[in-house]
Amino acid sequence: MFNLIKIFFLVSLLSKWVFCDESNNSNYNTNTSNTTSNTTSSSISASTINITESINTDVINVAVRTQRDVSKPIPIDQVGVAGISLNSVFDNQGYTADSLAELTNLLQLGTQVVLLTLYWNEFTSVWQLCPAPFPQNVTYYLNSLVNVTWNNNTYLCEYGFTTNDIMDTIFEYLQSSNTVFNVYFMHLLLNLKSIHYEKSNKTIDLENIYAPNSRTNIIGNTTLYDTVAPLSPYIFTPDVLESYQNSEANSTQSNYQQFYAQSNYTFPSLDSVLFLEVKRLLVNVVNNDLVDSRRVYSITLRDRSNIFFNNTMPSTTLDTAEADAFCDRVLNSANDIETFNNLSLYTHFRYVTDNNKKRFTMKGVRRYVKCGLSPVFNASSYQVTNDSFAQTSNQSYYPTANESLLDVEVAFEAFIPYNFWSFAPGQPIMNETTRGNVLSSDANVAYKCVAMNPDGWTVEDCYTEYQYACKNITSPNDWFISTRSRRSYFDIDNDACPDGYNFSLPRLSIEMAALYNVIKKENAEYPVWIDLNDITISTCFVSGGPYAQCPYQKTVTTKKFIRMIAPSSIVALVILFLIFLENLFRKNQLQTNRKKYWKKVLSEHYAKHEQEGVPS
């Protein structure tokens, strides 16, 4: 029997080793604070996440993820994002590999837009990062730092620093963040310019100096497609869009899809792109300043199949002055539903960029995102005061008042809380049962529900009675607020809103602007309840009322259940088999003879000592 126990122990260890090996080599780490991918596939991990591991997630990460989740039904051309122009990095670091570390950090901070300027070198016919050509009569090492001059401007450029380095850095970020919990949709915006010269007798010397040689292709690619090709597994291409538009015409549509089907240009929802098409990035030429000449770059069919241009995808890029005027129109209280519908249906991919003459401010950025614009930070430095930085950064370094932050990475981090169209800066509050840790023994208190305030969404006590927002089921910019009715979040049911409306929340910035407009027109009082809470799981904000389930809860599918019980089932079968073998081999001849012998001895003993009656 002792041997049987030892065998059972060894079999148990073996089963654990065999069946746990696969789970230990999972493609994705479910620790949401440091999730990385170990695969080169662009497929997003479909495994569910244990949300309890993210209880201490930074406020910013929760806000980013929540804004993404509520925007899932929205077409990608309407989803608000924020990002940086690499010019702001190169202005400080030079066109060198040193800028890659800063790009990596900016991506990890949540940059969802990267604006990249590419230069078509008419001397060598390649796309390059450096705004000036390299003289070919000088021998360079790949890591040579060279001061090159063109059009009376001098630039610090590293000879071997190419577009491939930028694409590889973005690819590594996309790969490492390719999980259900951390996946976001990015925009790679291209600004095309020429290194141009007018061919004449006077430029013969220039042609000799900058003529291509055997190392020309080291510093760039000959086509736009080749330039972005390292990102191809993740790119949402014009071909993918065309396929979607063809299939959408014959599919059953949700209320949101029916509304946006009225648009002059239909795009798939964020949810479809990320989780059905499994794409992470679109590449869009937002500005084409190529000089028309005999040596100008000719866009190829392969370029058009993988990259969007203005004639294949409409977009708008405004400067700060134009953006201010745009926001004045959008946030005008005289607007009606039709105004907001036109913005949602007939304007697409709305960006605003700044420059060193007029930089973004926190207040300005906040206004831009509220009126439906996506800010792209393009200046080389920003003014950030000590107070505002201290409220938004975990770093030990604080700038003095009005100090210029030459490190754009630090400035962007300080601006992050102002980049959300949804949550107010510093929201959502987490790990609090009550505000100020005040708990009354005779009253229910639960800061788990979200309400609208003048500066965005805030977490409020679910038991407090506020006015609440009702949205038209078929028209997402049509809102109703009853100024005579106040309810706690828990008491807002299906009968709380008029027919054709339900208790809901804004899912993009234009809907939010329309709701602000109604609140002002109806003289409603803030806060106003919207349908969003983290009642079920802390930091997992969901819509659908107080009983809505977090999509990231750890669930057990049939397949997973079989995998879970398989080891114990096999161990049980092995044990039964061993018991059967033991019983089988116990019946040997020696044991049989022994039994017969003792049976005979006992029979003879009873025969000799047979007694009558009951012994006294």
UniProtKB/Swiss-Prot annotation:
Parts of the chain that traverse the membrane: 565-585
Pfam families in alphabetical order: TIM-barrel_MTC6 (PF25506)
Membrane topology of this protein: Single-pass type I membrane protein
InterPro entries membership: Telomere_Capping_Maintenance
Record's signal peptide: 1-20
Function noted in UniProt: May be involved in telomere capping.
The name this protein goes by in its record: Maintenance of telomere capping protein 6
Name of the encoding gene: MTC6
